[in-house]
């Protein structure tokens, strides 16, 4: 819940100046109130994502938005399962999976977020947590992996200034690909994009992206 219309516009203008790598898919996730505005000013090389949506098409869910509404204004992406939705709003794995399933069924592409808390990392439960969260998504995604990006975002590294070291991030991504190979398919493990999110800056982005399993 950050930014305003001017800040969003400034970000878009910066991206427009580019040049953007044609091999990189650029997606901006913006607050719902700015979705239509940003969709109207981005060039065709940049996509727009909602930061959340609900699990049904319509109904008495005041304050929520649906995949159909997101599609209606021309956006094609949604971020689901963000750690703040999980920790602050109490969204559990099964609810995130329901949202992912409905979004995919309605033609949206999904950035599905997973990640452990500091307590879970210090207890040595990082893999247990991210595997559990990903396992919940498998039935929701089915054969739709081409429209899904996984985002590994350790909760303790979001907005705190703390960052998982590039090697720590790589280790989790590699373990996740191995798990996907056994529990989804080797093709999914090799092809799915797994991003890292958590206090990423211009200074550390290049080092993070140099690792083979970090997209």
Curated annotation (Swiss-Prot):
Gene3D superfamilies (UniProt xref): Aldolase class I
Q: What is this protein called?
A: Triosephosphate isomerase
Specify the taxonomic lineage: Eukaryota, Metazoa, Ecdysozoa, Arthropoda, Hexapoda
Task: One GO cellular component term, please give it.
Answer: cytosol
Q: Which GO terms describe its molecular function?
A: triose-phosphate isomerase activity
Q: Which InterPro entries match?
A: Aldolase_TIM, TIM_sf, TrioseP_Isoase_bac/euk, Triosephosphate_isomerase, Triosephosphate_isomerase_AS
Per the record, the pathway is: Carbohydrate biosynthesis; gluconeogenesis; Carbohydrate degradation; glycolysis; D-glyceraldehyde 3-phosphate from glycerone phosphate: step 1/1
Reactions mediated catalytically = D-glyceraldehyde 3-phosphate = dihydroxyacetone phosphate
What EC number(s) is this enzyme filed under?
A: 5.3.1.1
Instruction: Relate the assembly described in the record.
Output: Homodimer.
Any one biological process term the GO annotation gives = gluconeogenesis
Q: Which organism is it from?
A: Heliothis virescens
